[in-house]
Regions:
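Cap/lid segment of the alpha/beta-hydrolase catalytic domain
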Residues: 65-80, 89-95, 109-111, 351-355, ...
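A flexible loop/linker signature enriched in serine peptidases of the S9 family
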Residues: 39-46, 67-71, 90-99, 114-117, ...
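Blade-edge beta-strand/turn elements of extracellular beta-propeller
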Residues: 61-64, 105-117, 161-173, 212-222, ...
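Non-catalytic accessory segments flanking enzyme active sites
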Residues: 1-78, 89, 178-210, 215-234, ...
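Short coil/turn segments that connect the beta-strands within blades of beta-propeller domains
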Residues: 32, 82-84, 127-129, 189, ...
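Beta-propeller blade signature
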Residues: 49-51, 101-105, 148-161, 205-212, ...
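A conserved hydrophobic secondary-structure block that centers on an alpha-helix together
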Residues: 57-131
């Protein structure tokens, strides 16, 4: 199919031109060393590196381009606070399963220690003698990519010993659906244990272990599972949390573990009219940096530890920021600033001077001044006002004939933000409009926005997305014959569900790695953890609303469906590929029209990662060629 589309090669070539630029990630500091990723331009994978100073001599730590197996990928790292030891992860064929390796950064020696079958990170203990990590029950041979992953436990691995001797730190066999995460506070004393219960949406518990106590007992600090709690840091024995308890847009509170009842909590930063998205405690505990967002655009405020506002961090413009993290003692931090038309630019921020310094700015081969970035608002079916990002060529005419790519996600409290995406540029150069609505189910307005799109409220997400399409048509941007829709993972589910509901509203659709069978998603790998978001297929009360939108079950014979390109990967062990296989087969069998129903399967790849840049650009070019063909477009990049 793709080979017959004449613009594929030109799109693919243009993508290569756009990605051929030197890339340097936002660095972070551990001890006296700085760590970052680099890419010279068109390297298949970025290279993880370090330097003793900013701008100093670079030492390559992990270069995935040298791995013998091209489907083995670098999957992250964890560096000790003093910058002397590194745990680093590899994954095979894009699987969520990780193998952990260890390197002495003083000598460059790769240690003999290796940890297998992890789906989590690791947390170094206070004296760097070992790491805490979580493990599920080991999968049966032959079922590594499909078997349910349950019964998580926290273990401790001491360097120099085999994994079989790792000691058990915490396990609740009576709670097989608890998901556990371990993190060591910067004080080197308190091990935090985060607990997520699959039956409770957007809530978690926080327990801790005082590693200096004689018995090292697990203390249930916050165990009601009634809100979200993010532990920022322990300062002088007091725990600072960001929480949405009694504050849907989040606040910061201080909890003394010796008297943790709520009447003893101290509110440090109250809830505001904007969404508090993150907070960091730096400067030896003197400063809280708090990141706020509202309708996709960010601001950063400074507070002292008592909650007195010290000022606002000056940002380069209107856009989004990532970063501002670090260790408690740090007096410098780093951030990346980006917007849809402003490529990610890296800055160093000094807490001592309250000034930002430009470190790195990419050079993209495109005239971004030829395009407009804006936010529009539309009414959904129930009168709710929904914001939507839009990107389009400056010379656009509202004549109803513009090609539109409408992209959605709408789930798990994930917020759409104004960030640069290089891969969008060819679409704009082809005369296309890019639209990204902030539909319910996401986190753009906090807890209530998320809760409005879960479980029995899931149809609200789909109707918000349909309302976005209708707005674009009614406003003269486009028409049904010129509209394509796209989404990945939860967004793939959205696209497939909307396609069933309104096949007349779109000309093309590209659902990627979506959950398509809502009655069986919980039977594979970590699918059971999504029951709080989707509903429980084993609960008779939930089956009715799950069946009401399940993409696989709502494909109808005799319907003229638009053109569809379904994408999945054969080693996806998060959303197993069977979802896309069976949905695609059913859609092909039911199609009453002439439009193609295509299934694109990536070999030896997972839900994300593993494939190199060239293959990722192949996939992007295929999708744009598909849209170009099915929407009857004329321009090519």
């Amino acid at each position: 199919y793709i080979g017959s589309i004449r613009v594929y090669e030109s799109i693919r070539g243009r993508l290569s031109e756009l990605y051929d630029y030197e890339y340097v990630s936002m660095p972070y500091r551990r001890g006296e060393r700085y760590f970052f990723h680099m890419n010279k331009g068109l390297q298949e994978h970025s290279v993880f590196s370090m330097a003793d100073s900013l701008g100093g001599e670079i030492t390559v730590l992990v270069d995935p381009n040298t791995f013998e197996d091209e489907r083995r990928s670098f999957a992250g790292s964890s560096i000790t606070d003093d910058g002397t030891l590194m745990a680093w992860f590899t994954s095979s064929s894009g699987s969520d399963w990780k193998t952990v390796h260890f390197t002495n950064l003083e000598t460059g020696e790769v240690l003999s220690d290796t940890l297998f079958w992890l789906k989590s990170g690791v947390a170094w203990n206070g004296d760097n003698s070992g790491v805490f990590y979580t493990m599920y029950d080991l999968p049966e041979e032959g079922e590594e990519y499909t078997q349910e992953n349950r019964n998580q436990k926290i273990l401790f691995h001491r360097l120099g010993t085999p994994q079989e001797q790792d000691s058990l730190v915490y396990h609740r066999p009576d709670m097989p659906d608890w998901m556990l995460y371990a993190g060591m506070m910067d004080d080197g004393r308190h091990l935090a244990i985060y607990i997520y219960d699959a039956s409770v949406a957007a809530c978690n518990g926080v327990f801790f272990v005082d590693m200096e106590s004689a018995d090292r007992q697990v203390v249930e600090l916050l165990g009601d599972f009634d809100a979200a709690y993010y532990l920022l840091e322990a300062v002088s024995g007091v725990f600072y949390f960001m929480t949405d308890l009694d504050a849907p847009r989040y606040r910061v509170v201080a909890v003394d573990p010796s008297s943790p009842s709520r009447e003893n909590w101290v509110e440090i930063i109250p809830e505001s009219n904007q969404l508090l998205q993150w907070a960091s405690i730096l400067g030896g505990g003197s400063t809280i940096l708090a990141g706020y967002t509202w309708e996709g655009y960010d601001s950063v405020l400074r507070f002292d530890l008592e909650g007195n506002m010290l000022g606002e961090v000056e940002l380069p413009g209107r856009g989004s920021v990532w970063g501002f993290g670090g260790e408690l003692s740090d007096t410098e931090t780093f951030f990346t600033f980006s917007s849809f038309l402003n490529p990610g630019t890296v800055y160093r921020y000094s807490l001592e001077t309250d000034e930002s310094t430009l470190l790195w700015q990419p050079e993209i081969d495109a005239d971004l001044s030829a395009y407009t970035e804006t936010m529009v608002y539309y009414e959904s079916f129930d009168g709710t006002r929904i914001p939507m990002f839009m990107l389009y060529p400056e010379d656009i005419e509202l004549n109803g004939s513009n090609p539109v790519l409408l992209v959605g996600y709408g789930g798990f409290g994930v917020s759409n933000r104004a960030s640069f995406r290089t891969s969008i540029i060819p679409w704009l150069e082809m005369g296309g409009i890019y639209a990204l609505p902030c539909i319910r189910g996401g986190g753009e307005y906090g807890r209530e926005w998320h809760m409005a799109g879960i479980r029995e409220n899931r149809p609200t997400v789909f109707r918000d997305f349909i309302a976005a399409a209708e707005f674009l048509i009614d406003s003269g941007y486009t028409s049904p014959d010129k509209m394509a829709i796209s989404g990945a993972s939860n967004g793939g589910t959205l696209v497939a569900a909307v396609l069933n509901m309104r096949p007349d509203l779109f000309r093309a659709a590209a659902p990627t790695t979506g959950v398509m069978d809502m009655l069986r998603f919980h039977k594979f790998t970590v699918g059971w953890a999504w029951k709080s978001e989707f509903g429980d297929p084993d609960d008779p009360d939930d089956i009715e609303f799950l069946l009401g939108y399940s993409p696989y079950h709502n494909v109808l014979e005799g319907v003229e469906y638009p053109s569809v390109m379904i994408s999945t990967a054969d080693h996806d062990d998060r959303v197993v590929p069977g979802h896309s296989y069976k949905y695609g087969a059913r859609l092909q069998a039911a199609q009453a029209g002439d439009s193609p129903i295509l299934l694109r399967i990536t070999s030896r790849a997972g839900h994300g990662g593993s494939i190199g840049l060239s293959e990722a650009l192949d996939h992007a070019a295929e999708r744009y060629a598909f849209y170009w063909q099915e929407l009857g477009m004329e321009e090519s990049p």
